[in-house]
Amino acid sequence: MRINPGEITKVLEEKIKSFEEKIDLEDTGKVIQVGDGIARAYGLNKVMVSELVEFVETGVKGVAFNLEEDNVGIIILGEYKDIKEGHTVRRLKRIIEVPVGEELLGRVVNPLGEPLDGKGPINAKNFRPIEIKAPGVIYRKPVDTPLQTGIKAIDSMIPIGRGQRELIIGDRQTGKTAIAIDTIINQKGQGVYCIYVAIGQKKSAIARIIDKLRQYGAMEYTTVVVASASDPASLQYIAPYAGCAMGEYFAYSGRDALVVYDDLSKHAVAYRQLSLLMRRPPGREAYPGDIFYLHSRLLERAVRLNDKLGGGSLTALPIVETQANDISAYIPTNVISITDGQIYLEPGLFYAGQRPAINVGLSVSRVGGSAQIKAMKQVAGMLRIDLAQYRELETFAQFATELDPATRAQIIRGQRLMELLKQEQYSPMPVEEQVVVLFAGVRGYLDDLPVEEVRRFEKEFLRFMHEKHQDILDDIKTKKELTSETEEKLKKAIEEFKTTFRV
């Protein structure tokens, strides 16, 4: 049999002409550009915004971020160095989910829920999408239970309730993280599960925080979510949503959870980086137009659920860093307007030795007051007034030579109360102890003491109360109010102690 080469060529040409390439452009695509943690892909015609995609050759995941006419912008969740032009991307037809549940307690994970602590895999039984719609008004109930921070200045004048969103704001190195960590340590035995989300921080700083939480036994009920400064912007962007989903698991199963976002300034910077790389139009301070929505959809998920949904709560403590005390910058004003109050820390107070450096005049809690225990309300009302008057007179007193006795008494009281509000780091105080020491302050029992003796008085007085008058502390703890009977006992106890206290 003779083979005619011309005939074979003709057949091949016809076959090639009639060949139709069946590429599935609906569920797959090809990478046309990659770099700086983002990729652009051709195809993926049916992909939805925020949908999870996978780079087939490397197994790395990404999120569809920009849907454009001729391509899809993808943020890469992990190492992008091995992804090359021409690689295949496929839809996964779901959004990012993270493992949730008790299995994560005591663990350090990345924003995808993968362990970073070398303690083996996390065998979680439950998963939750990182983005959900915040529950509406009818699914919520008013904030009515206190979340004790153990910090006198906060629990007395800026009280936080379970289900509240309270912003901690201030310049760098003013003690913002310290307040959040103290609050987590103080939840020991309170039935509150804690999630600490570290965004864009140095790994050494995060390691120090984890070490402190371990040291004080707080890791038993805490999960740490880490997206450090060396992680891609994409992971820093999803970190708070992942932490929120982990906290929501407890809230929706009728328990109480606390999430600390440390900090949302770096979160906004990571989102700005991704948006600019994706060529989204920049707005004020080069942030994209939807930067407000970025934080509002996160913080609206803090909730106090009604009894029908189990009555659980998710409390949020976002942290925002200011530059040179400027709380009127873009991100600070955004987050202030979203949250239910703010704790404002001032470098001036910090360097003057007033720690925690809380500016009580500019700090406010818009809903926590209704969650405060009655005993604390009874002493805190006077405290707030005394300090407000002291702040007014303080500047005036520096210039005035002669002061009338009433003004002098007000300044003396204010100085002692400011001293009383100082507190060591990592030493949160139970609410009943706070009530008795603040009672001594606002009722003038410290007015005749030198300012430098106030801290020693507080320490020895509490020891005396535990040794001789534990019944008063127990009474405040159980009844949650200062009855006239308890008040009389407390006055007698303070007077008794003052006879033995030597200056």
UniProtKB/Swiss-Prot annotation:
Name used for this protein in its record: ATP synthase subunit alpha
Gene that specifies this protein: atpA
Membrane association type: Peripheral membrane protein
Site note Required for activity, residues: S363
Organism whose genome encodes this protein: Thermotoga maritima (strain ATCC 43589 / DSM 3109 / JCM 10099 / NBRC 100826 / MSB8)
Main location: membrane
GO CC annotation terms, alphabetical: plasma membrane; proton-transporting ATP synthase complex
InterPro entries referenced in this protein's UniProt entry, alphabetically: ATP_synth_asu-like_sf, ATP_synth_asu_C, ATP_synth_asu_C_sf, ATP_synth_F1_a_nt-bd_dom, ATP_synth_F1_asu, ATPase_a/bsu_AS, ATPase_F1/V1/A1_a/bsu_N, ATPase_F1/V1/A1_a/bsu_N_sf
Keywords, alphabetical: ATP synthesis, ATP-binding, Cell inner membrane, Cell membrane, CF(1), Hydrogen ion transport, Ion transport, Membrane, Nucleotide-binding, Translocase, Transport
Signal sequence region: none
Family that this chain belongs to: Belongs to the ATPase alpha/beta chains family.
Highest classification ranks of the organism: Bacteria, Thermotogati, Thermotogota, Thermotogae, Thermotogales
Binding site for ATP: G170, D171, R172, Q173, T174, G175, K176, T177
